[in-house]
Amino acid sequence: MTQLADLRRSYVLGSLSETDVAPDPMSQFKRWFDEAVTAKLPEPNAMTLATVDADGQPSARIVLLKGIDDRGFTFFTNYESRKGLDLAANPRAALLFHWVQLERQVRVEGRVEKVSDDESDAYFATRPLGSRVGAWASAQSREVPGRDVLEQREQEYRSKFGENPPRPPHWGGYRLVPTALEFWQGRPSRLHDRIAFRLQPGGDWQIVRLSP
């Protein structure tokens, strides 16, 4: 077995300074995200979403970013899933994007709110038919006796709704409204560049460099 202590690499692809970044973090994120898309990285919109329940127990999972604008970061899920229940109890969360091939990470922290029904309806209508049916068939995060039960539910809802399943009331979007972002660029000798944006009471963003 490979020794974990021997698994390491040097980071040499780029650098990041306070003068390099955009004056607001959303513009900087869009810049880096566009570069990840241009580099044809697999699923550049994949992000780790970390939530905390009412008892302080954290959990994390990979979800897909489905919207980005000046308001924040949008994703969609089952409101009755574990993450949905966590967010109902504690509407604060963190995101992490890791673009390995570019030697970059972006960390995001903030409060989470539900998007409007119109936004959820509009996105749901763009999903493939199987995904729309699956949103009805899966009681996400709950125990299921076997896959056959899940597939039976899928067939039942496919027969019920045909080609036009409506959006389930328990399914929709969230928006993480950021209060802090950090842009990390790998550098040699583990002296990585870390540029952080912190939202100030007046609405401006403070830009600071953090030690690696």
Swiss-Prot record:
Binding site for substrate: R8, R9, S10, Y11, K66, Y123, R127, S131, R190, L191, H192
Signal peptide: none
GO process annotations (BP): pyridoxine biosynthetic process
Keywords, in A-Z order: Flavoprotein, FMN, Oxidoreductase, Pyridoxine biosynthesis
Keyword hit for Oxidoreductase: yes
SUPFAM superfamilies, sorted: FMN-binding split barrel
Keyword Cell cycle: no
Binding annotation for FMN: 61-66, 76-77, 82-83, 105, 140-141, 184, 194
Alphabetized Pfam families for the sequence: PNP_phzG_C, PNPOx_N
Cofactor(s) required for function per UniProt: FMN
A GO MF label: FMN binding
Gene3D superfamilies documented for this protein: Electron Transport, Fmn-binding Protein, Chain A
Catalytic activities: pyridoxamine 5'-phosphate + O2 + H2O = pyridoxal 5'-phosphate + H2O2 + NH4(+); pyridoxine 5'-phosphate + O2 = pyridoxal 5'-phosphate + H2O2
Cofactor notes: Binds 1 FMN per subunit.
Pathway this chain belongs to: Cofactor metabolism; pyridoxal 5'-phosphate salvage; pyridoxal 5'-phosphate from pyridoxamine 5'-phosphate: step 1/1; Cofactor metabolism; pyridoxal 5'-phosphate salvage; pyridoxal 5'-phosphate from pyridoxine 5'-phosphate: step 1/1
UniProt-listed Enzyme Commission number(s): 1.4.3.5
Family, as annotated: Belongs to the pyridoxamine 5'-phosphate oxidase family.
Subunit structure, as described in the record: Homodimer.
Protein purpose: Catalyzes the oxidation of either pyridoxine 5'-phosphate (PNP) or pyridoxamine 5'-phosphate (PMP) into pyridoxal 5'-phosphate (PLP).
Record HAMAP family: PdxH (MF_01629)
Protein name: Pyridoxine/pyridoxamine 5'-phosphate oxidase
